């Protein structure tokens, strides 16, 4: 009996350890699954975003007077060493944060040929930013997203992108009620060989201009590494109440790398596992999207 009870406890811990990202479907957007959407502007191409509707979403949401927060996400670069595919289908950060309680949208980086999603860096920057400007309001209108409660998050390349793309100009910056970046941040590191991220002095000047467009809205920055650069950079530019910083101890969370869950400490899967940092990030999301929060 004692061994059976122990086995039951261990099984429950394993079951509860990691959330499972909703499966992909070829059908229309629906609760509990990720659907591929090719918009009217990109019919005939492979440019697409993914969307997963909240677990309690129903087609009669308007009649029910229902609205949901929106978590929009930019993925990391193609980087096999960490398991990052660079594709929208590889995203996990936003779902781990919201757990089926929000509309989850994985935004594309529109390739320069406008025929596919880019898996390394930004593709056509203007087209990528325009895609968000067009489709975030569209998704809110079509599926009941609360336009006052849209958070943009990103991992690695996407962590840079929440500012580089999400604060690219005043129009796109107005879409978000808050930003969350995991592992990296716009202006923290020089990206040699790119036109936008080098030399460092110019890059940081441009990043500082972008960051001013946040205008006091909440920013969460989490880091599995690189805190020595990111934290001082933000502390010099932002007031303490508006931004939150947290380290994520990947070794404490996962042990050795690679393992059955992740290949590398630099990953976006940690939000699928319950831990103090996960709970803190989820609490931040709940606060930022609280029903009584003022309009942005």
Task: Pin down the residues of each PLM region.
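A domain-start/cap signature at the N-terminus of enzymes
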Residues: 16-68, 102, 198-199, 248, ...
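Gly/Ser-rich "nucleophile elbow"/oxyanion-hole loop immediately N-terminal to the catalytic nucleophile
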Residues: 57-66, 117-157
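Loop/turn elements at helix/coil->beta-strand transitions in domains of secreted/extracellular proteins
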Residues: 66-70, 99-104, 146-150, 172-178, ...
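Active-site machinery of serine-nucleophile hydrolases
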Residues: 67-70, 74-134
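Short glycine-enriched nucleophile-adjacent loop
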Residues: 159-171
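The feature captures the conserved acid-bearing segment of alpha/beta-hydrolase catalytic domains
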Residues: 171-276
């Amino acid at each position: 009996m004692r061994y059976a009870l122990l086995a039951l406890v261990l099984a429950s811990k394993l079951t509860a350890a990691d959330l499972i990202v909703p499966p992909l479907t070829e059908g229309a957007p629906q609760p509990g699954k990720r659907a591929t959407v090719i918009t009217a502007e990109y019919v005939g191409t492979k440019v697409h975003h993914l969307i997963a509707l909240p677990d309690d979403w129903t087609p009669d949401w308007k009649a029910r007077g229902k609205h949901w927060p929106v978590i929009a996400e930019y993925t990391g670069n193609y980087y096999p060493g960490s398991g990052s595919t660079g594709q929208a289908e590889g995203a996990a950060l936003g779902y781990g944060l919201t757990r089926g309680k929000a509309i989850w949208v994985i935004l594309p980086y529109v390739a320069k040929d406008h025929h596919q999603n880019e898996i390394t860096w930004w593709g056509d920057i203007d087209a990528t930013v325009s895609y968000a400007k067009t489709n975030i309001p569209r998704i809110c209108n079509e599926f009941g997203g609360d336009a006052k409660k849209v958070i943009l998050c990103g991992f690695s390349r996407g962590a840079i992108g929440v500012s580089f793309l999400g604060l690219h100009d005043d129009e796109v910056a107005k879409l978000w009620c808050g930003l969350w970046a995991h592992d990296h941040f716009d202006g923290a590191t020089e990206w040699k060989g790119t036109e936008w991220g080098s030399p460092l002095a110019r890059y940081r000047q441009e990043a500082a201009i972008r960051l001013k467009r946040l205008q006091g809205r909440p920013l969460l920055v989490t880091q599995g590494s690189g805190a020595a650069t990111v934290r001082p950079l933000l502390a010099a530019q932002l007031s303490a109440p508006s931004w939150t910083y947290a380290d994520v101890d990947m070794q404490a969370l996962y042990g050795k790398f690679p393992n059955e869950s992740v290949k590398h400490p630099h990953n976006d899967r940690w939000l699928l596992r319950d831990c103090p940092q996960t709970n803190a990030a989820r609490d931040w999301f709940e606060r930022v999207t609280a029903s009584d929060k003022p309009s942005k």
